[in-house]
Amino acid sequence: MTTAHRPQLEARNGAKGALVPTGTEHARLLPGHTELKARKPKNKTTSQIQTSSDAGSVDDSTSAGTNIGTGSATLGPSQVQKMIQPLEVEDKKDIKLVKKEDDSVSWGKTAFSRRKKVVKPEKFTNDTVRSQKHKEFLNRFVK
């Protein structure tokens, strides 16, 4: 690497002894790691275990079987099925509508389908016996 690639950290005109600031501060002169990384505790203390288990037990009791607001028991599987069925029917209708929209935007109605198909001439075959010209020649002159 040549000197052109390096930052100018000193004044140019021979003022090396007089420490003239240039206003540039290169990233290599700055400290890289300024914060210490603290370790996470591996083993919980007994007080932390008790507080976490207390918080968990409160959550478990609320979701165990009764709704707090109404005092009624949770829904059984058959009741849940009855509630889900209308939602599934609506989802199926939405899917059908999406398919119809996709059908309306098909490639059949674009300019590509309106173009006439051009019959391309046969490609060159490297084998002279199989080529179309050779077959026509044999039909005309050799019988």
From Swiss-Prot:
Residues 44-82 have a biased composition (Polar residues). One of its GO terms (biological process) is mRNA splicing, via spliceosome. Its main location: nucleus. Pfam families: Cwf_Cwc_15. It is found in: Nucleus. Keywords: mRNA processing, mRNA splicing, Nucleus, Spliceosome. InterPro entries: Cwf_Cwc_15. One of its GO terms (molecular function) is RNA binding. The keyword Nucleus applies. Residues 1-83 are annotated as: Disordered. One of its GO terms (cellular component) is Prp19 complex. Involved in pre-mRNA splicing. Associated with the spliceosome. Belongs to the CWC15 family. This is Pre-mRNA-splicing factor CWC15. It comes from Candida glabrata (strain ATCC 2001 / BCRC 20586 / JCM 3761 / NBRC 0622 / NRRL Y-65 / CBS 138). The gene is CWC15.
